[in-house]
């Protein structure tokens, strides 16, 4: 019995072109830094993380890895015509400030820097203290 193979349709990506302004979300944890660039409506233009750039293990948590991730995300977003961004920081990792510096150095105009780090109003019980 002959089985007919159906062609798989390739996933078509949306082409987001000429987006002059956007929002950069920087999530800096103790283990990694994730940089997502969206349009004002929240649709993702580009993203990068320290792991995606090529770092693994404890090197992902370094400030230099966050710089490389921010440069990679900014370069891809500027190909879509992005010029001006608002920066939303979340978390207390090592890559917070270095990611913002890399965005400015890559040629993006930063209009606002917002800190949206979630702070509990005495919510869940924290995990146990580390004993080294």
Swiss-Prot record:
GO terms for cellular component: ribonucleoprotein complex; ribosome. The keyword Endoplasmic reticulum does not apply. Keywords: Ribonucleoprotein, Ribosomal protein, RNA-binding, rRNA-binding. GO terms for biological process: translation. It comes from the Bacteria. InterPro entries: Ribosomal_uS11, Ribosomal_uS11_bac-type, Ribosomal_uS11_CS, Ribosomal_uS11_sf. Signal peptide: none annotated. GO terms for molecular function: rRNA binding; structural constituent of ribosome. HAMAP family: Ribosomal_uS11 (MF_01310). Part of the 30S ribosomal subunit. Interacts with proteins S7 and S18. Binds to IF-3. Belongs to the universal ribosomal protein uS11 family. Located on the platform of the 30S subunit, it bridges several disparate RNA helices of the 16S rRNA. Forms part of the Shine-Dalgarno cleft in the 70S ribosome. This is Small ribosomal subunit protein uS11. It comes from Chlamydia caviae (strain ATCC VR-813 / DSM 19441 / 03DC25 / GPIC). The lineage of its organism: Bacteria, Pseudomonadati, Chlamydiota, Chlamydiia, Chlamydiales.
